[in-house]
Regions:
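Aromatic-lined, polymer-binding surfaces characteristic
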Residues: 2-229
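N-terminal module-boundary/linker segments of secreted carbohydrate-active enzymes
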Residues: 1, 108, 302-306
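CBM-like carbohydrate-recognition segments
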Residues: 207, 228, 233-306
Length: 306
């Protein structure tokens, strides 16, 4: 879990998904593998930063849920796995808990921390924790009344819409720009400002950064889990997640289209967004879409989200 680029969680998720689709004899062996690997992962978070834990942990929690760990291994679930998950509520990783990371960082750090935070809340069916995390996510999608405590990098302010900047000298951005946002007359509707600022101050045409799809990778996992628990997350922020991908695809006014052809471990963002909105981003890719590769925190979505 301490390796920010580790992919083991994706393969644990694959074993869990295959296990629930096969006959009982083969399935039992795969489920045992999942439990074994989860056990081996415990403790590997020592020395990690919050981003690494945020990226890696969710897949293990989702895999445990898929195989119904409380039913097949109640002893391991109660005495090992659940106490470990509970520890993440207060444990600090380079000064941040998953909770404070989601609440402070309006970028890929925060979205991945939020995904693991929400996955844990879902596993425990902790409605209070999930509601609190959902409020932060709704704020991330643009509703400052829901939450507005994010700390932006200085360059992010140059990507904020002209309307906001004209309204007050103290204008505060929202992590995903609102519908119709413009900067100097250029379309920035849906820009994830604290990831796009990795390219520097506002410039046009804008430059590509893989941090934008990286941030959306954590966001779609948050939205997917929250939706399963009754939150209308895909509609929040005037369909902010769809608008964010639309801006990446926007190819007018000298801005090139940015899909995930050269960024395969972000392909799952397009699968999940298409599944949620009935959109066709996969069909609109510049390359022939391949089956989804291991992602930043989940994977195999070209199979699970058809």
């Amino acid at each position: 879990l301490a390796d920010v680029d580790e992919e083991t969680g994706n393969f644990v998720l694959a074993k869990a998904l295959v296990a629930v689709r096969l006959d009982s004899k083969v399935s039992a062996g795969l489920k045992d593998d999942v439990v074994k690997i989860i056990g081996q992962a415990i403790g590997t978070e020592n020395g990690a930063n919050a981003l690494a834990v945020g990226r890696n942990l969710a897949a293990y929690v989702i895999a445990a849920d898929i195989i119904d760990l409380p039913k097949i291994r109640p002893d391991f679930d109660e005495s090992v796995f659940r106490p470990w998950l509970r520890s993440f509520a207060t444990r600090k990783f380079t000064g941040r808990t998953l909770r404070s990371c989601q609440e402070d960082r309006p970028n890929n750090w925060g979205t991945h921390c939020g995904a693991s935070r929400i996955a844990i809340a879902a596993y425990f069916n902790d409605q209070m924790e999930m509601t609190q995390a959902a409020s932060v996510f709704q704020g991330w999608l643009g509703d400052r009344r829901s939450y507005s405590g994010f700390k932006f990098g200085p360059e992010a302010f140059s990507w904020v819409s002209d309307v906001c900047l004209r309204s007050a000298s103290s204008c505060q951005p929202v992590p995903v720009n609102p519908r119709g946002a413009l900067v100097n007359g250029h379309n920035v509707d849906g820009v994830v400002v604290d990831d796009q600022r990795r390219t520097g101050e506002f410039t046009w045409p804008p430059k590509y950064t893989y941090y934008s799809y990286g941030g959306l990778g954590g966001a779609v996992v948050q939205a997917g889990i929250l939706h399963r628990f009754g939150f209308d997350a895909w509609q929040w922020g005037d369909r902010a997640l769809k608008r964010a991908v639309e801006w990446m695809y926007y190819d007018g006014d000298r801005k090139p289209k940015w899909d995930t052809c050269d960024d395969a471990n972000k392909r799952y963002v397009l699968d999940v967004v298409d599944h949620a909105y009935g959109s066709n981003f996969i069909e609109r890719m510049n390359c022939a879409p391949e089956a989804s590769k291991p992602g930043r925190n989940i994977a195999w979505t070209s199979w699970t989200h058809q």
